[in-house]
């Protein structure tokens, strides 16, 4: 597994498993909302009224609607494993 995915995969998997609503901001400023249905190395399948395949290279930010945590495979809770939406970097004025 690539080092960059050691954080990405557990985060996306927790969002998928817990069916957490997310806002996905694309690099062009578009905001998509829904639940992560599935994902792989290159795409995320986002479900709302329809399913959309979103290429990861087009994604700027994934913002969960509520805090989500994941744990490492070692069973220890390491720093940086909690994620929460509503941080100061969230953009509310993005074109929809």
Curated annotation (Swiss-Prot):
Alphabetical list of SUPFAM superfamilies matching this protein: Sm-like ribonucleoproteins
Protein name: RNA-binding protein Hfq
Pfam families: Hfq (PF17209)
Taxonomic source organism: Proteus mirabilis (strain HI4320)
The gene coding this protein: hfq
Residue ranges, annotated region (Disordered): 64-96
Stored InterPro entries: Hfq (IPR005001), LSM_dom_sf (IPR010920), Sm (IPR047575)
One cellular-component annotation, GO: cytosol
Subunit description: Homohexamer.
